[in-house]
Amino acid sequence: AELPFDTSFLQAFEGREGQTEHPILLCTVGRFSYPKAIDRAVYICRQLVQQSIDVCWYVVGYGGDELLIRKAIAETGMEKHFVLVGKQINPYPYIKACDIYVQPSRYEGKAVTVREAQILGKSVAITRFPTSSSQLEEGVDGIIIPNNAEGAAEGLAQFIADKQQQEAIKEQLRIRHYGNEKEVDKIYSAIEG
């Protein structure tokens, strides 16, 4: 399918270890800060790659932890699997293009991007934190994975392998209404440009 935005960032994934024709595209949108745990997501990604799962994880955002995250990417050798896209005025096409939206936060209030990903019909995986059960209905419109690198990688690997669960969640997302239809229309308008 042709994507309605600049996909040149996907070239960064070329030549990755265990490359397949159809990699799993993971997306995260968020501030590069300690609570959002983008630095830890690099290690989650490495564990998935070590399990021979062909993932391409791209992150839309910016923030004070960018150097820390870039250092983690270099130290783990994940340059071909974990890419920082940078700040984008319109993150919706990036969310729409992924297979699974991942919110790897250490803690979170209410992640608006999780709801936006659900509105866009994306399977969602979030880490367990005090308010995570208010974000989604576990196993129905997303999954909650452990809030540590090893457990999150294990939970994400199981979810990636379980295509039936992903499809069941996507079906739930199609039939649920997450709020104001005008907001949904705005998101689709933003995607279409």
Which stretches of residues belong to each language-model region?
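Conserved donor-binding/catalytic core segment of Leloir-type glycosyltransferases
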Residues: 18-36, 42-45
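Nucleotide-activated donor-binding/catalytic signature segment of Leloir-type glycosyltransferases, i.e.
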Residues: 70-86
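Aromatic "clamp/platform" in nucleotide-sugar-dependent glycosyltransferases that forms part
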Residues: 87, 106
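Short acidic/histidine- and often glycine-rich active-site loop of Leloir-type glycosyltransferases
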Residues: 116, 129-139, 143-144
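Short hydrophobic beta-strand element within catalytic cores of glycosyltransferases
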Residues: 123-127
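Conserved acidic donor-binding segment of nucleotide-sugar-dependent glycosyltransferases
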Residues: 138-139, 143-149, 158-163
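A charged, aromatic-enriched C-terminal amphipathic alpha-helix characteristic of glycosyltransferases
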Residues: 147, 164-192
